[in-house]
């Protein structure tokens, strides 16, 4: 009863939650609450009143379960996709900046080459003029005046200044080109580091998706086991209640028939024998080697430990398969970029909601069996009334006890 109250409170709290905060367990709590309401309706009006409604409700709850599971997986995938898109945009921006920088370097080199070509042409022209002057000086025996000598010295000084300026410009441009090359190397190193970070993030994303699928499979398996155990427990309790009710009716009917026949003493003897047989049965149960030796809580603890061990074994198997696949890929040595793993919709197993609502079909079978047993008891009572004067034989009493 306390577990039922706890599940009912959990289902009511799940109904009061916000839609964005719902989990798969909340959906199953809601399904449990709906199942209890169906039980009440069946107890009052029978199974035929809601026989056509149950499949539709089950389908709606399954759709809600799928949507909630997608909603919990979608935010993490969206964040990873946004991070990947941001890294791609940064990479594209850096590539674009490198292209612009390369174009600027090419333009600077073209300008430098043009200026160098002009200066070289000027140098060649000056050298030609110098040669002509030297030839003219060799052919002429005219002595230069001091003014002409100073003029010639000024021309040579001007050439030296031009050459010095050209050398300074060339050295400066060479230093700029070296600095640009260094910056380009640093940019390339940054791009390689970003690519390595991108591959690492994609690998982490793949591992996280793998773990999410494993955890979802474990959760679904545990939820299905819980639902099956709850359904079995409910059916067993209902069967025990029906059997107790039938046993009480049979005892009342037997006592009434014996009182009508005026055989009160055999009834007392029969009651004494039943008490003795029950005491012997208790003694035999205490001596029985197959009697239960565990409490319900201990059994639950053992089942819980078994489920944890199963989940650990499942995780280890998944990790072993994953590492084996990585070793096979490394042996093949095929350098391929890690693919972007898009989430694929795996074939959905049988939902736990169907298992939760499957006990209604068992209730129908149980009601049919109880009706058949009641008919048998009625026919047996009619036969006993017809043969009231003859008394009960030993075979009839054994059959009555068996029933």
Curated annotation (Swiss-Prot):
Sites bearing S-nitrosocysteine, chain numbering: 47
Coiled coil regions, renumbered to chain: 76-265
Subcellular location: Cytoplasm, Cytosol; Cytoplasm, Cytoskeleton, Microtubule organizing center, Centrosome, Centriole; Cytoplasm, Cytoskeleton, Cilium basal body
RH1 domain span: 10-97
Free-text description of this protein's post-translational modifications in UniProt: S-nitrosylation is required for the interaction with GAPDH.
CDD domains: RILP-like
Entry keywords, A to Z: Cell projection, Cilium, Coiled coil, Cytoplasm, Cytoskeleton, Phosphoprotein, Protein transport, S-nitrosylation, Transport
Gene3D superfamilies: 1.20.58.1770, 6.10.230.10
Positions where Phosphoserine occurs in the chain: 7
Gene Ontology, cellular component aspect: centriole; centrosome; ciliary basal body; cilium; cytoplasm; cytosol; membrane
Protein name: RILP-like protein 1
């Amino acid at each position: 009863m306390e577990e039922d109250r706890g599940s009912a409170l959990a289902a009511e709290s799940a109904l009061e939650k916000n839609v964005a905060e719902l989990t798969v367990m909340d959906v199953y709590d809601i399904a449990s609450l709906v199942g209890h309401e169906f039980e009440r309706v069946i107890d009052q009006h029978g199974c035929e009143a809601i026989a056509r409604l149950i499949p539709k409700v089950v389908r709606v709850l399954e759709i809600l379960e799928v949507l909630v599971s997608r909603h919990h997986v979608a935010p993490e995938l969206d964040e990873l996709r946004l991070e990947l898109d941001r890294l791609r945009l940064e990479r594209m921006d850096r590539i674009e900046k490198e292209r612009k920088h390369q174009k600027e370097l090419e333009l600077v080199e073209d300008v430098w080459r043009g200026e160098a070509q002009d200066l070289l042409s000027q140098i060649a022209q000056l050298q030609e003029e110098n040669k002509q002057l030297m030839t003219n000086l060799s052919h002429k025996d005219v002595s230069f005046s001091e003014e002409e000598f100073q003029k010639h010295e000024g021309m040579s000084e001007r050439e030296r200044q031009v050459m010095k300026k050209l050398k300074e410009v060339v050295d400066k441009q060479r230093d700029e080109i070296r600095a640009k090359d260094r910056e380009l190397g640093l940019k390339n190193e940054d791009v390689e580091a970003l690519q390595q970070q991108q591959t690492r993030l994609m690998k982490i994303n793949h591992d996280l998706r793998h773990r999410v699928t494993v955890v979802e499979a474990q959760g679904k398996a545990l939820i299905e086991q819980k639902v099956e155990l709850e359904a079995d427990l409910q059916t067993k309790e209902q069967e025990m209640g029906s059997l107790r009710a039938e046993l009480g009716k049979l005892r009342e009917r037997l006592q009434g028939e014996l009182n009508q026949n005026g055989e009160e003493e055999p009834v007392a003897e029969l009651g004494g024998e039943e008490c003795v047989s029950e005491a012997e049965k208790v003694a035999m149960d205490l001596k029985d080697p197959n009697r239960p030796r565990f409490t319900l809580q201990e059994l639950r603890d053992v089942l819980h430990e078994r489920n944890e061990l199963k989940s650990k074994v499942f995780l280890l198997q998944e990790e072993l398969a994953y590492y084996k696949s990585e070793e096979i890929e490394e042996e093949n040595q095929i350098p391929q970029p890690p693919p972007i793993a898009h989430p694929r919709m795996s074939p959905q197993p049988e939902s736990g909601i169907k298992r939760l609502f499957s006990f209604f079909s068992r209730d129908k079978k149980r009601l049919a069996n109880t009706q058949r047993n009641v008919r048998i008891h009625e026919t047996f009572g009619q036969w006993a009334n017809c043969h009231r004067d003859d008394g009960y034989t030993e075979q009839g009493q054994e059959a009555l006890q068996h029933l």
